Amino acid sequence: MLSQAEKGGVQNTIQNCVTVLQNDPILADSIRLNLLSERIDIVKPMGWQRSGPTLTDTDMMYILRRMEKYGLYSEKRVSAAIRIVANENHYHPIRDYLNDLKWDGTERISHALHRFLGAAEDELTAEALKIFLLGAIKRVFHPGCKFEMMLCLVGGQGAGKSSFFRLLAIKDEWFSDDLRRMDDDNVFRKLQGHWIMEMSEMIATANAKSIEEIKSFLSKQKETYKIPYETHPADRLRQCVFAGTTNRQDFLPRDRTGNRRFIPIPVDAAQAEVHILDNEAESRAYIDQLWAEAMTIYNSGDYKLTFSPAMQEALQICQKDFMQEDTQAGMIYAFLEDYTGDRVCSKQLYAEALGNLNLPAEWETRAICEIMTAGIANGEIRGWTAHKAAKRYPKYGVQKGWERVTAAKVDADGFVELTDEEAQQMGFPF
């Protein structure tokens, strides 16, 4: 029942508009808020030509004309009522899809990348795909959850790498390969409404200003953005995951502190059992069961979105095959092999190992420290350790740096000779 004005006629109120939208035989149950795209959808046939589910200006004209039959003429109030009704009737298409799946009990995750792309059937490949699928599921059920992993398929053109990710997204509108830059002011618009974002040929990472920008982008859990009809910006929690495809062997951005976010999986079309597009219907049915298997794991709660220590070690070994050459690290390693001194500092390495005549910028000394820290940790640099306190260097002043690790002297009777400092600390009367 619509409220009436004192002088007769229907009141032009938001509530009256809501009542019509909820009860009119054409409009009822047709307007819903899509929680994935954060747009309003029309989900029923409306009696006029439409090209997609998202509410358009043309749809608004037809709805306004329909509202006039009830004596409601305020476009502003109708628009407000539409947002209220849509919000009260929200849905999430990917959650609905995943919740409707029934797993047939056949394990496919461990085999899928070999079947379609000829990847190795090993534990790292299986674990990488499993974590990627679980991360994608968690992102839609818990938007903004922490998930930094990027599954990267590496192999020749025509193998079906992009097609795999497109079909994995289930619907084409849930997939995008349109992300070219990570510093795009409209990056939320690029991500909005998509589940799987492919970085084709790793263009976005290649265009990044630094490895820090890449790491920061992949680690983000939200974007702050104002969509057109809103007055204030709001946090938009990420619901997508990122995938990479490339045919370059040296695609991994150089990161001396570790590339844990990038999971390279080599593929070989010649080893694949089927091409993913040979029979698309069969491939889609297989992928439905991939997600069903992943949902079974997700619902059990018995999973982690990180690799075990053993798998992390296997990943680091795998990543070495895809690293860009670190020429500066090589120059520093070579310098230390021939160097006869007992101490070095970053300024010394900048000048003497890398051959620079100017003073280093802060980021350049930081890069040298990263090379030394990583080299000592991974065994590329042996016999050196960071000294605990800053020391004076003749040409470079007081600096923190590194010193040779000296073996303790052992006499013929097997006793270790103590330094004067060690003896004093132990209280011996010398």
What are these regions (language model features)?
Residues 1-108, 123-127, 358-363, 374, ...:
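N-terminal nucleic-acid engagement/recognition segments and initiation subdomains in replication
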Residues 82-192, 347:
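P-loop NTPase catalytic core of nucleic-acid-dependent motor ATPases
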Residues 187-192, 227-245:
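AAA+/SF3 P-loop NTPase mechanochemical coupling elements
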Residues 193-195, 221, 238-241, 257-262:
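Short glycine-/polar-rich loops that comprise or flank the Walker A/P-loop
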Residues 196-218, 252-258:
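Conserved AAA+/SF3 P-loop NTPase catalytic/coupling segment centered on the Walker-B
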Residues 211-234:
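Conserved catalytic/switch belt of AAA+ P-loop NTPases
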Residues 254-272:
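A short helix-turn-beta junction within AAA+ P-loop NTPase domains corresponding to the substrate/partner-engaging
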Residues 305-430:
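DNA transaction DNA-binding modules
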